[in-house]
Amino acid sequence: KFKKDNPIFEVRDISKSFDGRPILKKLSIKVFPGECVGILGPNGCGKTTLFSMCIGEQNPEGGKIYLNNKAIDQIPIHLRSKEGLGYLPQQRSVFNMSVYDNILGIAQISIKGIENQKAITEKLLDEFNLQHLRSLNASVLSGGEIRRLMMARVMINKPKIVLLDEPLAALDPLVIQDIQKYILKIQSMGTAILVTDHNVKNLFDIADRSYVLGEHTVIA
């Protein structure tokens, strides 16, 4: 189903510890273009630490991370999104302004020309079912609506891969099903996905394949 000769994203033998306590040991993961890959593991197993290294918040003590065959530590942090990396943190991360301006504000940073910026904003409002919320301040949105808004913003740069850190956490079952549909919509746009969760069913419903983390590395 997916070409397995050239990963769009690779974690190769990554290790990390805090205060002498190992968090990750020689962790290796591959994501190929267009596929949705899950990382399953309990809270505290290192999933968020892995993503923080991918976006440059932390540095690994050993191993390498590659984005489109380029060592990610050779790509300046502010250019990683232009190289095709998108990231959705677990915590709510929106601006205290309207839904429309939340998307347009990011578009103005990333895209040239006000008409192009407005066009992509309208397109993403449609794609993620946000048109009816466009004038609302993002601070009043529900958990599921916040997730859809964050997904819309991360797609502005048309990333090659999106890292989703526990996007289904603290959501009601019906909202989880709704957000799963939008995760698959991102994949249908041609974007690969690496998504973490501690619930096996949540990943089973969306992932083409999954890695299981335990004892600081992949165990299955």
Task: Write out the residue ranges for each language-model feature.
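Conserved ABC ATPase signature
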Residues: 137-141, 145
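Conserved ABC ATPase "signature" region
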Residues: 115-133
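The feature captures the beta-strand-to-loop junction immediately N-terminal to the Walker
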Residues: 40-42
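Conserved ABC transporter NBD signature motif
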Residues: 63-71, 83
